[in-house]
């Protein structure tokens, strides 16, 4: 069992006294290596014995090929053995028999040809290659072997004939390139041009034309280079279509003209390519054009190139999807940066004409920003206030307010009117918004506007309408109360808070209660604060409320302390014993309430807060008293509705544990009494149980 668990552990990890080197390990491995078995050398005494051996081997090979004719290795081994015996005629016979079985096997043809070449039978090898390429004209390795043999023999006309035969089968580009390299090696450039013409007719791809153009740059004139490029563009467009024209042709053509210092020709080529190629296929062309203008153009030309490029990009994108508002944003910013007012206005008008197809708010969220940006641009850049106001009105009339609205549009329109000094129009705009489609944000902005103008009566009216519209919004009640408190109307503030806490539905009622309690505490109304805490506990008997209540009692100064306090006094006084006693009563009430309702987790959090309080303000006895009430954790399991079990943490309090023990003692006494009544022999047990219970 120990060995099956893994390799043995090394207990002593100290270095060994004798170290083993890598050289020693390799030497031992070589010394211990077993010697491979070697076939003993056969020696033949005379020719008759050799013939007998050859006959026996031939019979074995014949048996092999007869049993499995389709296995190529048998034929190759047979032929190779005959070659080793210098029996070339027999070897040819074996190869020919193998070709009858495998006439399309490239490896067999190549081995046959190599055998003839090795034995200097060149004519036979040439005939074999002729047969091979006739039989398998699509196998490039046979053609290359044939061409290699012909060129090594110095038969260049024969090599051309082989190439011509091969080119009739329209091979791949490498074959054409090999033919061209042959003519270049022997200085036949006119023949190479003719090959290029046939090459581009068979493979009219851009890279083929680029190879031809590069050839003409090396061995031709500028006119022939231009002719090649022009023919390439025209031929590719006619045979493969306009989309097949590659940007690399324009780039190479323009760079060639730039090298000749024909900058106007190069610029015309770049522009022609950009105008006729789609943007997705002219990215690199545009990058080269930009570089060209930076090198040989002026600043305006460079900026125009960049703007044109991006403008083409955005035009294609909006053509594909006119409802892509993010593209319209970028398009408008581009025209703004260009400084052309008419172009910018045209883009904005085209953009806002793309009304969302449905009346769903999610489709309108990006669309309305087009109006906002358009109006701001008209206001700031062109100073056309009338057009900006018209844009806002168009947007508001276009939005289906019965289904949804956008507060930001109403607020932007109001701020616009304020900037123009039209305060009445701004109020009418916000009032119209509240009347048509009230929203919390509109109320908030309207109230903020009136507060800045110190129109507090208008603020009160707006707050009244706001709480009528949405009485569950706690922040509205709190802001209203803060306004009244700032105006030093405490009774109105209390009335607002009372209305708020009496609402049946609030989104965050605890926030309102806290604001109300903080208000009374800051005003020094401690009895009112206590009453609020008691009312809150009736609604929400939560540990946080009890803890906050206790903290409040600690922070309340006594009457004597209130009289002694002055505004200049900054020293912090210790907490009085009366405040500590009040806080302890709160903790005791809370603990009793949670104990009766068996709220264990809440009870633990309360005890932790109580213990922290005693550590800060209590004595050692008080701390020990609370620590004795702290529970211990235990893990239990409970059954779920789907008949599975889950593990949870439960708390066992010392008081509850003692009650359980007392109940167990009582049950033991009852059980003993039952046994005594049944058999009469349990008196001793009853006495022992009674003693245990009394103890």
From Swiss-Prot:
InterPro entries linked to this entry: HAT, HAT_Syf1-like_N, HAT_Syf1_CNRKL1_C, Syf1-like, TPR-like_helical_dom_sf, TPR_rpt
Which Gene Ontology BP terms does the record give?
A: mRNA splicing, via spliceosome; spliceosomal complex assembly
Output the Pfam families linked to this UniProt entry. Answer: HAT_PRP39_C (PF23241), HAT_Syf1_CNRKL1_C (PF23231), HAT_Syf1_CNRKL1_N (PF23233)
Superkingdom: Eukaryota
Please indicate if the UniProt record lists Repeat as a keyword.
Answer: yes
Localization annotation: Nucleus
| GO cellular component: a single term | U2-type catalytic step 2 spliceosome
User: Which SUPFAM superfamilies has this protein been placed in?
Assistant: TPR-like
Q: Please report the residue spans annotated as repeat (HAT).
A: 52-84, 86-118, 120-152, 154-185, 187-218, 220-259, 261-295, 305-337, 339-373, 383-419, 421-452, 454-486, 488-522, 524-555, 578-616, 621-654
Query: Which terms are listed as keywords in the entry?
Result: mRNA processing, mRNA splicing, Nucleus, Repeat, Spliceosome
Q: Record keywords: Kinase included?
A: no
Using the UniProt record, give the first listed, main subcellular location. Answer: nucleus
What Gene3D superfamilies does the annotation carry? Tetratricopeptide repeat domain
PANTHER family in the cross-refs: CROOKED NECK-LIKE PROTEIN 1, PRE-MRNA SPLICING FACTOR
What is known about what this protein does?
Answer: Involved in pre-mRNA splicing and cell cycle progression. Required for the spliceosome assembly and initiation of the DNA replication.
The family classification in the record reads: Belongs to the crooked-neck family.
Q: How does it assemble?
A: Associated with the spliceosome.
Q: What is this protein called?
A: Pre-mRNA-splicing factor clf-1
Could you tell me which species this protein originates from? Neurospora crassa (strain ATCC 24698 / 74-OR23-1A / CBS 708.71 / DSM 1257 / FGSC 987)
Lineage of the organism = Eukaryota, Fungi, Dikarya, Ascomycota, Pezizomycotina
């Amino acid at each position: 069992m120990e060995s099956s668990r893994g390799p043995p552990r090394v207990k002593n990890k100290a270095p060994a006294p004798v170290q083993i080197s890598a050289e020693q390990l390799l030497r031992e491995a070589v010394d211990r290596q077993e010697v491979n078995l070697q076939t003993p050398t056969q020696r033949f005494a005379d020719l008759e014995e050799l013939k007998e051996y050859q006959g026996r081997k031939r019979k074995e090979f014949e048996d092999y090929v007869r049993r499995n004719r389709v296995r190529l290795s048998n034929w190759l081994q047979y032929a190779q053995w005959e070659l080793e015996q210098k029996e070339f005629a027999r070897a040819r016979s074996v190869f020919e028999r193998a070709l009858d079985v495998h006439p399309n096997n490239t490896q067999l043809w190549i081995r046959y040809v190599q055998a003839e070449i090795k034995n200097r039978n060149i004519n036979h090898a040439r005939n074999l290659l002729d047969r091979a390429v006739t039989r398998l004209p699509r196998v490039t390795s046979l053609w290359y072997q044939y061409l290699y043999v012909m060129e090594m023999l110095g038969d260049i006309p024969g090599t051309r004939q082989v190439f011509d035969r091969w080119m009739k089968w329209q091979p791949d580009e490498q074959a054409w390139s090999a033919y061209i390299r042959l003519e270049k090696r022997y200085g036949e450039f006119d023949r190479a041009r003719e090959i290029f013409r046939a090459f581009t007719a068979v493979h009219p791809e851009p890279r083929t034309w680029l190879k031809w153009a590069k050839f003409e740059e090396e061995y031709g004139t500028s006119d022939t280079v231009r002719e090649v490029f022009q023919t390439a563009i025209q031929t590719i467009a006619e045979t493969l279509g306009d989309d097949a024209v590659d940007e690399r042709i324009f780039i190479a053509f323009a760079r060639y003209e730039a090298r000749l210092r024909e900058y106007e020709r190069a610029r015309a080529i770049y522009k022609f390519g950009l105008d006729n190629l789609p943007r997705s296929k002219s990215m690199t062309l545009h990058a080269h054009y930009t570089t060209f203008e930076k090198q040989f153009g002026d600043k305006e030309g460079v900026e125009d190139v960049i703007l044109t490029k991006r403008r083409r990009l955005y035009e294609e994108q909006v053509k594909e999807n006119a409802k892509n508002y993010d593209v319209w944003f970028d398009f408008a910013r581009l025209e703004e940066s260009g400084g052309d007012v008419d172009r910018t206005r045209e883009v904005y008008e085209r953009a806002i004409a793309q009304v969302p197809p449905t009346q769903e708010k999610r489709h309108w969220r990006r669309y309305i920003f087009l109006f906002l940006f358009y109006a701001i641009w008209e206001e700031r850049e062109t100073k056309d206030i009338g057009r900006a106001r018209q844009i806002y009105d168009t947007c508001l009339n276009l939005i289906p307010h019965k289904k949804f609205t956008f507060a930001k549009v109403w607020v932007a329109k109001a701020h616009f009117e304020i900037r123009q000094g039209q305060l009445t129009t701004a109020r009418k705009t916000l009032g119209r918004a509240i009347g048509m489609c009230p929203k919390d944000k509109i109320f908030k902005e309207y109230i903020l506007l009136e507060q800045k103008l110190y129109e507090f009566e208008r603020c009160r009216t707006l707050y009244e309408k706001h709480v009528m519209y949405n009485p569950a919004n706690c922040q509205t009640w709190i802001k209203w109360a803060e306004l009244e408190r700032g105006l030093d109307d405490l009774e109105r503030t209390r009335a607002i808070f009372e209305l708020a806490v009496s609402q049946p539905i609030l989104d965050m009622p605890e926030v309102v209660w806290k604001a109300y309690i903080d208000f009374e505490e800051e005003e020094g109304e401690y009895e009112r604060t206590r009453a609020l805490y008691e009312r809150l506990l009736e609604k929400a008997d939560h540990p946080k409320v009890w803890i906050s209540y206790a903290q409040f009692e600690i922070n309340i100064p006594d009457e004597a302390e209130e009289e002694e306090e002055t505004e200049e006094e900054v020293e912090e006084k210790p907490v009085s014993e009366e405040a500590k006693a009040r806080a302890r009563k709160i903790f005791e009430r809370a603990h009793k309430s949670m104990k009766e309702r068996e709220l264990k987790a809440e009870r633990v959090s309360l005890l932790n807060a109580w213990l922290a309080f005693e550590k800060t303000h209590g004595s050692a006895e008080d701390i020990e008293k609370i620590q004795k009430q702290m529970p211990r954790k235990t893990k239990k399991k409970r059954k779920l509705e789907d008949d599975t079990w889950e593990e949870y943490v439960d708390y066992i309090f010392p008081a509850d544990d003692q009650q359980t023990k007392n109940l167990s003692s009582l049950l033991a006494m009852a059980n003993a009494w039952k046994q005594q009544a049944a058999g009469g022999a349990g008196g001793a047990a009853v006495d022992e149980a009674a003693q245990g219970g009394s103890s």
